[in-house]
Amino acid sequence: MSVSDGAATGSVRYSRVLLKVSGEAFVGEKRFGFDPAVVLRLSRDLKNVKESGVELCIVVGGGNIFRGASTSDGFERTSNDYVGMLATVINALALQNALEEMGVECRVLSAMPMTAVCETYVRRRAVRHLEKGRVVICAAGIGSPFFTTDTAAALRGIEMRCDAIFKGTQVDGVYSSDPKKDGSAVRYDRISYHDLLSSNLKIMDAAAISLARENSVPIIVFDLGRDGAFFEAVHGRGLFTTISD
């Protein structure tokens, strides 16, 4: 692992990337649902990345609406997860609307058939949308309970042959511990899949990390809450952590 010595610089370019956006990213200063200002800022960042020539696929979470695995009262796990999948579709449609208002053509593809509101996810169809210059927003995880949207992000990134998976978080990379709770936390510019898993650093779940590792797809962790951070990370600038072998 490489300890950070400042902002990363470089001319790294990706032709096709996947961005994982957690449901919490939509909340902003609110406790629940959507903060319109946050959705607008995120959409502007996505548009800038798209207009720089990068094909963009997005997997959204649903934690701003329903926290499936952590909400057990009155629900069994399978029902929890299906409700959570529906929450991701709500987020995907909201993001699609914001992007289209900015003139960005995009499609929502759901792993659960919902033909009245969006297309059903088919890999070839999703790839074709990317090739036509559309942003693809994947919803409903992988369509099965017991799998997180992090795992869905890894799977979709691999299926669609993305050059990298970008994980938007609330901090500017991977730290040795939570920097919001531990002032001595060390930030890494680079860390291996093995070190990440063995250190039990909770960036993504183990299944997602293992999928990326087995298919040699790097994961880039950055601060999605900072304006322009996604554009910078895609182009090899700014603060981020690269997870790879």
UniProtKB/Swiss-Prot annotation:
Signal peptide bounds: none
Keywords assigned: ATP-binding, Cytoplasm, Kinase, Nucleotide-binding, Pyrimidine biosynthesis, Transferase
This protein's record includes keyword Lipid biosynthesis: no
Primary residence: cytoplasm
InterPro entries: AceGlu_kinase-like_sf, Asp/Glu/Uridylate_kinase, Uridylate_kinase, Uridylate_kinase_bac
Catalysed conversion reaction: UMP + ATP = UDP + ADP
Binding site for UMP: G62, D81, I142, G143, S144, P145, F146, F147, T148, T149
Example of a GO cellular component annotation carried by this entry: cytoplasm
Record entry for activity regulation: Inhibited by UTP.
Pathway: Pyrimidine metabolism; CTP biosynthesis via de novo pathway; UDP from UMP (UMPK route): step 1/1
Record has Transferase as a keyword: yes
Binding residues for ATP: K20, V21, S22, G23, G63, R67, T169, Q170, Y175, D178
GO biological process: 'de novo' CTP biosynthetic process; UDP biosynthetic process
GO MF annotations, alphabetized: ATP binding; UMP kinase activity
Documented EC number(s): 2.7.4.22
Protein's cellular compartments: Cytoplasm
Top-level taxon in the UniProt lineage: Bacteria
Cysteines joined through disulfide linkages: none
Function: Catalyzes the reversible phosphorylation of UMP to UDP.
Cross-referenced HAMAP family: PyrH_B
Assembly information from the UniProt record: Homohexamer.
Family named by the database record: Belongs to the UMP kinase family.
Name of the molecule in the record: Uridylate kinase
Gene that encodes the chain: pyrH
